[in-house]
């Protein structure tokens, strides 16, 4: 075992111990899924920031930046940061006050079980690519720090198991505790690495000159309709498509009060936006420090540019810092993306099939499904080996953008929105997206933009085509009953 690998193993065991200790405090399903709705502001900020700052931020976005500038990363970090800010501004307080366990519960309360199940399925499926990206990154880390002695696939299995153990025992509470520690390691580690990389490159001014020379600060597209449409589509994919995601919802709902939920999400988004530029700066330094090697890697395997700089051009302690920071980023995101779909499946699909569960039965079901989902996504990640990390992640959010975003917004902000409108929105949004994705039409007009526009149109048409329910007793019991269809209650 190399010294670097030994440090990585010690770090993994340390975070595992923290997670397991936190797990001793989990007594109920709410403790497991939402950390008992008790987290202070600092933990909401760190766990929100941690969820976003994953493998794609460290290795994916940074490589995309030096390949095409800011225009190439509009989706993440620009769209991703605004997503968290929008959640804090427009969604967190409203959803927190409803005391829900999952985002799927909102769809059931607002529109009924059919919408709950459809939106939950879309949300769960969207996690496949995101979790696969984190698992792939974990495998790559083990492969690199072992000098190739551990294959990427074996590393994927080891890393996934190290995350699974503490999430199974501690749920959201374990994630919040480990995220707090891991974000300290991440921020400190990458900040020191950035300082050292800048020094190797000849100072920040040289890096800035390189960026200006290569036009890397160009943000807006060419003034052509095709380019503008695809730019807008890329921006809204994570900006809006991530809003109805269970992992964000869990962090919002885990706060001790509504104000903390809102502030935590906004601050987390601002922190993410600021710090996402650090890996970009480091990779820009790599282009100056090792120009020929960086050029070759950018053409063959862009995700390895940053790790190669660290391994070949920096001292041992810098390598420990970097891989500690990288593992922190990957593990925090992986833990969140394993827990979120598992809780959604149990709460919004399994319970509908099986019927009512006691609190203990639900807690047990959360853990069993978590293990099963992890096994499935690990298999999927191994099968998808070779797909760029950034692409895995960006595709994931298109599902929820087209299927779940419009019903969420309309339900919160438009009283006339009803079950029929929501069903029409989901069906038309997803169908349009798939149609364009599977045909040459998708090269002319972005599939996700077409999908969300059709979803919005279908929501309006479907809701207005059905008269609102105005029965006085029904309205008295259900404040939002005016949005229910004439011949159907919202809880059917």
Label each region the model flagged:
Residues 1-492:
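Membrane-embedded helix-loop-helix hairpins and adjacent transmembrane boundary segments
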